[in-house]
């Protein structure tokens, strides 16, 4: 288990608890009362820390190396019904953007999302979750296929941004993202977006338009990362905490500004502390969202979605 800097008090108490339990197992000393006392302190400390997280600490949690990624959610939710589909039919198959068909109960869904790696090798293979233009074009191809067959779409967002390399720009990174945003606003099937980690810039927006946009409790969604914002405004990454506060990037901030529709509660300590619980919660959220939109006609669906986005950012005096 890896710990973030603000989780050090929890780490210390967990080590104390582990040592006390080991002493009890290896000797005849009764440490039951001590273990219970430490366990009580541990619960109180966890509540104290996680109920008062700063925006920057939530950013840190969203990047936790043990946090579940897109394929973890899809495999847990769909089981062996998931069939991955590949390629944009033009350039190549972008490994940073995955997608395919799967079932939740008896209902088929088209799943799309950015995928990160678990170690150095797989992180390079997945390009750290930063998709190229062909990744966004693959995502659009899958969404258009879903529209053709009347299958609802689920997008899992978890990216530090679209890949900013020269080759990506040469192949039309900006156009690919813009095209996705345009097409998603008028797609004639329900679209549900779940932000499961980082939601950075146009890289997130490229698969982020939906009838219902949900954010996990410890995720963020912003035009720029706190570090990049800090380096632009203050010429240093040292002010990233201040930048995170100013950007209003947390799920609570997004809900308050009506830029998302729902906050999905995470287990205490983050999604990685109880994977089964967060998988079941996300599955229920998707199923509930589908129940809400499944009876709308195609015209009503598109009109409602367009109306939602046209209302964003409108000043009312």
Curated annotation (Swiss-Prot):
Q: What pathway does the UniProt record associate with this protein?
A: Lipid metabolism; malonyl-CoA biosynthesis; malonyl-CoA from acetyl-CoA: step 1/1
Q: What does this protein do?
A: Component of the acetyl coenzyme A carboxylase (ACC) complex. First, biotin carboxylase catalyzes the carboxylation of biotin on its carrier protein (BCCP) and then the CO(2) group is transferred by the carboxyltransferase to acetyl-CoA to form malonyl-CoA.
What are the CoA carboxyltransferase C-terminal domain coordinates in residue numbering? 37-292
Pfam families membership: ACCA (PF03255)
Q: What is one process in the GO biological process aspect for this record?
A: malonyl-CoA biosynthetic process
Q: Which HAMAP family would you find in this protein's record? A: AcetylCoA_CT_alpha
Q: Which family does it belong to?
A: Belongs to the AccA family.
Catalysed transformations (reactions): N(6)-carboxybiotinyl-L-lysyl-[protein] + acetyl-CoA = N(6)-biotinyl-L-lysyl-[protein] + malonyl-CoA
Q: Which InterPro entries match?
A: Acetyl_CoA_COase_a_su (IPR001095), ClpP/crotonase-like_dom_sf (IPR029045), COA_CT_C (IPR011763)
According to its UniProt record, the EC number is 2.1.3.15
> What are the annotated GO cellular component locations?
acetyl-CoA carboxylase complex
**Any idea where this protein resides?**
Cytoplasm
* Keywords, ordered alphabetically: ATP-binding, Cytoplasm, Fatty acid biosynthesis, Fatty acid metabolism, Lipid biosynthesis, Lipid metabolism, Nucleotide-binding, Transferase
Q: Report quaternary structure and partners.
A: Acetyl-CoA carboxylase is a heterohexamer composed of biotin carboxyl carrier protein (AccB), biotin carboxylase (AccC) and two subunits each of ACCase subunit alpha (AccA) and ACCase subunit beta (AccD).
What Gene Ontology molecular function terms does this protein carry?
Answer: acetyl-CoA carboxylase activity; ATP binding; carboxyl- or carbamoyltransferase activity
Q: Does the keyword Nucleotide-binding apply?
A: yes
Establish whether keyword Transferase is in the entry. yes
Q: State the protein's name.
A: Acetyl-coenzyme A carboxylase carboxyl transferase subunit alpha
């Amino acid at each position: 288990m890896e710990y973030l800097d603000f989780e050090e008090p929890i780490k210390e108490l967990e080590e104390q608890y582990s040592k006390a339990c080991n002493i009890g197992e290896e000797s005849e000393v009764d440490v039951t009362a001590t273990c219970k006392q430490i366990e009580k302190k541990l619960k109180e400390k966890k509540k104290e820390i996680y109920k008062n997280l700063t925006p920057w600490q939530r950013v840190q949690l969203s990047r936790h190396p043990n946090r579940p990624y897109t394929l973890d959610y899809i495999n847990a939710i769909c089981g062996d019904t998931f069939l991955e589909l590949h390629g944009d039919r033009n350039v190549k198959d972008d490994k940073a953007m995955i997608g395919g068909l799967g079932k939740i109960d008896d209902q088929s869904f088209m799943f799309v999302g950015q995928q990160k790696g678990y170690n150095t090798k797989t992180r390079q293979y997945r390009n750290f979750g930063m998709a190229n233009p062909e990744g966004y074009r693959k995502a659009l191809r899958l969404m258009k296929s879903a529209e053709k067959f009347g299958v609802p779409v689920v997008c899992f967002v978890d990216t530090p941004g679209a890949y900013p390399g020269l080759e990506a720009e040469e192949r039309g990174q900006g156009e690919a993202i813009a095209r996705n945003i345009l097409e998603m606003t008028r797609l004639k099937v329900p679209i549900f977006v779940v932000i499961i980690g980082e939601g950075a810039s146009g890289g997130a927006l490229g698969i982020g338009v939906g009838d219902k946009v949900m954010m996990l409790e410890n995720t963020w969604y912003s035009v720029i990362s706190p570090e990049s914002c800090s380096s632009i405004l203050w010429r240093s990454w040292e002010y990233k905490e201040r930048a995170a506060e100013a950007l209003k990037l947390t799920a609570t901030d997004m809900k308050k500004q009506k830029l998302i529709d729902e906050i999905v509660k995470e287990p205490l300590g983050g999604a990685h502390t109880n994977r089964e619980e967060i998988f079941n919660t996300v599955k229920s959220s998707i199923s509930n969202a589908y129940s809400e939109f499944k009876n709308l006609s195609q015209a009503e669906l598109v009109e409602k979605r367009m109306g939602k986005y046209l209302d964003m950012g409108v000043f009312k005096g």
